[in-house]
């Protein structure tokens, strides 16, 4: 690394990582798994476009810090998904990267050992190995697209991705979303602004050229054709924004922008007033709107773990409680199971009219 009076003044170290090609060669997808992921992406695309009447439910831990916990959660989630599949399409949250308002643990890829060692190469390997195990269970997977380089390493394993509230306004992330191979949800801004998400969705649907890395790890000029499978995610802001009036306002603004109204409601964050225990109430309110004839709401997002609440990510790993989030607080598996079964029962036989 060149370091002198003008170059890398604030850089203290440089490590060359394995390339996306090398990671995929070490942890390859089978042809059957490729077909499975392509099929789940199509199912989600059909739901967003109104061709499939089911409700998309992106549900799971706020973040993944322990692969064993993730696998146990996935086994329960898979069994439930099979039981409710006629009206709900369940996709498991597998979030490895966490945007921070200031500082804090940035996720399993960035610091997999949670000790400040920042062993990113190990993080990428742990993440891809876990994703392959989850795909092998037959689960469609969701993530937040945060680092623009990560999709080259892991993007082939995901069926849906989100652009978060802190990055929806970023040109870098809009360009990245235009090239992602799966449907993408855009969250409204942290201030509640709908225009931020709607403009991002419009931008990502267009072709772009930008600098990124290719599968060989080389810096390359990438050209995209645009991503047609975008939708808005209402996550609240200074106040919740999932009421019928809020949903109608989002529909209006999307139509004015020339977009088909297609939106998901995040039951956590601003919509729960940051109280994880309110997520079921938010979900039930949204389901009531669907039962009343709403066709623009295509999905729900729920933060859920094996056990409820959260814990500090700064304590020693040996002292961490099993199955408890180290980022946002989550509802328990028992509450998740009961909620999704209730939604399934409420929507039973009521969704066929939603097909466009």
Swiss-Prot record:
Pathway terms, separated by semicolons: Metabolic intermediate biosynthesis; chorismate biosynthesis; chorismate from D-erythrose 4-phosphate and phosphoenolpyruvate: step 1/7
NCBIfam families associated with the record: aroFGH (TIGR00034), PRK12755.1 (NF009395)
Keywords noted in UniProt: Amino-acid biosynthesis, Aromatic amino acid biosynthesis, Transferase
Coiled-coil intervals, chain numbering: none
Function: Stereospecific condensation of phosphoenolpyruvate (PEP) and D-erythrose-4-phosphate (E4P) giving rise to 3-deoxy-D-arabino-heptulosonate-7-phosphate (DAHP).
Protein name: Phospho-2-dehydro-3-deoxyheptonate aldolase, Tyr-sensitive
Family: Belongs to the class-I DAHP synthase family.
EC number in record: 2.5.1.54
Cofactors: a divalent metal cation
Gene (UniProt): aroF
Transmembrane stretches, start-end: none
Regulation: Specifically feedback inhibited by tyrosine with 50% inhibition observed at 9 microM tyrosine, pH 7.0.
Top-level division of the source organism's lineage: Bacteria
A GO-annotated cellular component: cytoplasm
């Amino acid at each position: 690394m060149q370091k002198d009076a003008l170059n890398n003044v604030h850089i203290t170290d440089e490590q060359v990582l394995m390339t996306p090609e090398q990671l995929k060669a070490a942890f390859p997808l089978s042809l059957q798994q490729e077909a499975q992921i392509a099929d789940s992406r199509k199912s989600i695309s059909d739901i967003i476009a109104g061709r499939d009447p089911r409700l998309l439910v992106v549900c799971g831990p706020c973040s993944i810090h322990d692969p064993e916990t993730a696998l146990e959660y996935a086994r329960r989630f898979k069994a439930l998904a099979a039981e409710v599949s006629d009206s709900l399409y369940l996709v498991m949250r597998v979030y490895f990267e966490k945007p921070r308002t200031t500082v804090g643990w940035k996720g399993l890829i960035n610091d997999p050992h949670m000790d400040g060692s920042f062993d990113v190469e190990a993080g990428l390997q742990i993440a891809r190995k876990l994703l392959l195990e989850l795909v092998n269970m037959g689960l469609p997977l969701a993530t937040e697209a945060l680092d623009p380089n990560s999709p080259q390493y892991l993007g082939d394993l995901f069926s849906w991705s989100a652009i978060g509230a802190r990055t929806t306004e970023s040109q870098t992330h809009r360009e990245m979303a235009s090239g992602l191979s799966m449907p993408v949800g855009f969250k409204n801004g942290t201030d509640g602004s709908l225009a931020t998400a709607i403009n991002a969705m419009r931008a990502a649907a267009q072709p772009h050229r930008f600098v990124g890395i290719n599968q060989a790890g080389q810096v390359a000029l990438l050209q995209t054709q645009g991503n047609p499978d975008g939708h808005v995610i209402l996550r609240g802001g200074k106040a919740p924004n999932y009421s019928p009036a809020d949903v109608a306002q989002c529909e209006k603004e999307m139509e004015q922008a020339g977009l088909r109204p297609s939106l998901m409601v995040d039951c956590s964050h601003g919509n729960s007033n940051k109280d994880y225990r309110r997520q079921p109430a938010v979900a039930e309110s949204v389901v009531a709107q669907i039962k009343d004839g709403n066709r623009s709401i295509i999905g729900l997002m729920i933060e859920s773990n094996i056990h409820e609440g959260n814990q500090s990510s700064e304590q020693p790993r040996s002292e961490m409680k099993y199955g408890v989030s180290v980022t946002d607080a989550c509802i328990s598996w028992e509450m998740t199971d009961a909620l999704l079964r209730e939604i399934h029962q409420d929507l039973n036989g009521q969704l066929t009219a939603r097909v466009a």
